């Protein structure tokens, strides 16, 4: 357990950057849970060095300092971190009570973390205006009191770092139209969903809400091009993101929803995932299994090509592990839902 007998020692330190979607995901989660925490803005290595704490490998934001074997250790990766916090802080749960719905939440959280991030990285560096904006603001998110010459130096470094990462998310001239259309479709579905329900899976946020929220903080609050798109077609989404930043005051009611209670908009979202997130996750896993450095696939609306990404292959394996944990009747219920929305290959591929 993360909790100790001393309240003071249960104030968790975490490092990140305001322009990091996963940092924003975890801050909003901790606020909703009312878990005491301190946010440290700054370069991870610079912050950890005086503490004699080794940085995680690789360094992914945010970085939490958590007790491991009697000493503080730098820990990263938001999804298992949320699970660890949920086990220690069961009040105000972000996992649905219903087992089938909890699995759907797990898939949607991964969709937010692994597909919606493609929107974010694509828009941040694909267009000149967005790349210039990111190059200027990313270093200022770490330290604002720097000279113009220092800013120019850091701007070049940050811009290069962002562009070098595009291969991971598959952003290129060939895939750009598909990413743009997928982002707009996602916004339209979420906009329609928010007309009838305040959160993705009920009356209070689940972990999948925070995953989607994290990416959207950047898409509508940092990068010019996707922000303009969102303001044109999804005003409810904009309001939703702004309010989810701090839901510590939301009084949580018992959530007794089941899979059959999900509105049509969630089915629509999974159908959208079936032509984007699902086939690319499976193609990437196949490439990793075959030892291929890159892969391509024909999607309904165009060709997708990118370098193989080992971490996302692990994500698909974890989804299957979660599915195998389900009771037989719940497994059948989930499979029917996935099959209805053309996503069953998430749990059947490579069987």
What does each of the following model-derived ranges do?
Residues 3, 49-58:
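Short glycine-biased active-site loop of nucleotidyltransferases that positions the nucleotide triphosphate
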Residues 200-220:
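GST superfamily/GST-like fold recognition
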Residues 1-8, 12:
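Single conserved hydrophobic/aromatic residue that forms the stacking wall/gate
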Residues 97, 102, 197-207:
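All-alpha amphipathic helical-bundle segments outside canonical DNA-binding/catalytic cores
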Residues 13-43, 54, 80, 89-91:
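N-terminal G-site helix/loop of the GST-like fold
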Residues 213-304:
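Active-site/pore-lining binding-face segments in mid-to-C-terminal subdomains
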